[in-house]
Amino acid sequence: PSSKGKTLFNLLPLKSHQSISSIMPLPENESEWKKLYVIFATLNGKIRKNSLDDFANIQSTGKIAMKLDEDDKIIGVIICREDQDIILSTRLGKCIRFMSKKLRIFKGRSSKGIKGIELGTNDKVISLSVLDAVDISPKIAKDLLKNGSADKAKRSEIIAKQKYILSLTENGFGKRTSFYDYRVTNRGGKGIIGIVASSRNGNVAASFPVNEGDEVILSTDKGKVIRCAVKE
């Protein structure tokens, strides 16, 4: 735990103005890549969808994946399927959820992307996540979860599929919210409040999907870590 880590410069030489923003595993079976997509999200709320197959061959010096404005940068890259939803979260506590299948697929790598979320003053995107889509409205799902005498089979199905969005703030506060509370909308909207960014809480540091039985490890910018159960 006390190790300072190893440099990745031997794997990917970076220029002085560049930094690593995302690391993701790929399916070992490359025949699956044609069915998958890569989602890019930027600090200023832009989003882009490419076929994973577009990046099947990358030279050792890397490949330009997306054009960016001078004041923008990539904050996250993630693999998704057509039947999944995308969630963008901002540092001032806003979240927006929309369908992956409604994003057009970009063929080249020269585009700056399209608007994923409309940001308020001084707000920036800090997290990109993927969730499995559900075929039930949030209102019906929440009603079934609250009503113990409801259709037991349907209620059990909803509980089994339920995930949570865990939002953590810079001052160490967290909030766990059912993903049924995040209704699916069109991309480019203002989103809803996922967690309040107040003087007590601070701005949002991270927001990501979890299961109730998961454990998470939280790390500070000084290298301290803590491990705790999501249900706590």
Language-model regions, residue ranges each:
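Short, structured "edge-of-domain" segments at secondary-structure transitions
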Residues: 1-232
